[in-house]
Amino acid sequence: MTASPSIRDVLDFWFLPLDHPDHGKPQELWWSGPAEFDAEIRERFSAAFERAIGGAFDHWRQSPDGALALILLCDQFPRNMHRRSAHAFAGDAKALEVARVALARAYPAAFNLTMRLFFYMPFQHSESLPDQDLGCALFEAFDDAETMKHAIEHRDVIVRFGRFPHRNDVLGRACTDQELDYLKNANRYGQ
């Protein structure tokens, strides 16, 4: 485990190395969350994640590659490393901050659609309706029904409840009766 991975270490781990035939292509394990994958992320990046949310890698946001790596480190990795715990969401504010900077600088345009998706995920993970609205607008550009379906599902939960009820237990929030009914059959988005 290293507390100071390089930008390339993060990007190569998530998207595979540049010379790999599947570099930058969708990977099923991103969404399926096998325990071995979660453990590998924890082993390789947990110390770096803690440093990242404390600002140690803020300089990464000065480049498109760096911003994407920092978003992954603060948004995607903790959802795997700390699945079903409050710490899964500890990097959300940092990831959202970096995503806003990246959008303002048009960084996502430097990447293929699969990689670009991860610049937008912090908006989909936000419990703010304006962030959700922006996320849906960004995901529309993908012209992919499945991607858009997930974005709308996330937004609809925020419209309905003002938060993600599946986070309530780990965040110490009480559920309303409506949220309890919803959680009986709801998608927990890997959490």
Region locations from a protein language model:
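Intrinsically disordered, low-complexity activation-like regions
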Residues: 1-84, 89-191
